[in-house]
Amino acid sequence: MALDNYTYRTFTYLAGDWTGDSAAIEMLHTWNSGHKWGLSFKDIHSETQSSDDSHNCSIKVSLRKRMKLCKKFVIVVGSETANLRSGACYTCFWYKKPDMYNLMPGCYLNNHVDNRSYVQFECEMAKHDYDNDDMDIVVLYNSVNVNRNLCPEPLRWVGTHAAMKKKVTDYLGNNHIEWDYDSVKKAIG
């Protein structure tokens, strides 16, 4: 369905490192779709997808449209989330590097140069909406600990932060790590 058909903020926006933390993001989808779990959200990304051949700038326009329809921003933070570069203009085929004739970087498509990653861009939009009381922010760590140093700077000290995993000791005294549904459910609401 086209996003233009929606007018209210009714969706949840999921963000994160879709390669490094894909298992954690997939677990959120599993909990959301399973009948035995009480987690319930409507993922904006399930409504529309960008094509893989889209330019970074057009993907960011699409992300902005999606964000405007969301009431909650959930980001999964892993060890590399704050360092992601995907989406930065300098990673695009159409990026013009500065040279001796043009001291400023540019775009062969005449678009504005924005060297923020997709995640940085999403976090800054979410923080803006949070500051305007338009959005709740939930930061979930793909870990047993909440480590705000791993969180992208705009969201480091706002919203609800929770770990997605917990340490468990089995009946034999062996320790292992498992998903912490209760922590996630409490954070997302």
Residue ranges and their predicted role:
Residues T81-D129, N149:
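Conserved TIR/SEFIR loop-to-helix hotspot centered on a Trp-containing motif
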Residues M1-F73, V77-S79, Y181, K185-G189:
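Conserved N-terminal substructure of TIR/SEFIR domains
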Residues D129-I137:
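A short helix->loop->beta-strand "cap" motif at the edges of active sites that frequently abuts
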Residues M27-T30, A88-T91, P152-L155:
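Short, glycine/charged-enriched secondary-structure capping and boundary segments
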Residues T19, E80-A82, V144-V146:
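Solvent-exposed loop/turn segments at secondary-structure junctions
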Residues D43-E47, K71-V74, M104-N110, T169-N174:
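Short C-terminal domain-edge/linker segments immediately following a structured domain
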Residues A2-T7, F11, Y141-G189:
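C-terminal interaction surface of TIR/SEFIR-family domains
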Residues V74, D136-L140:
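Hydrophobic/aromatic beta-strand patches that form the interior of the parallel beta-sheet core
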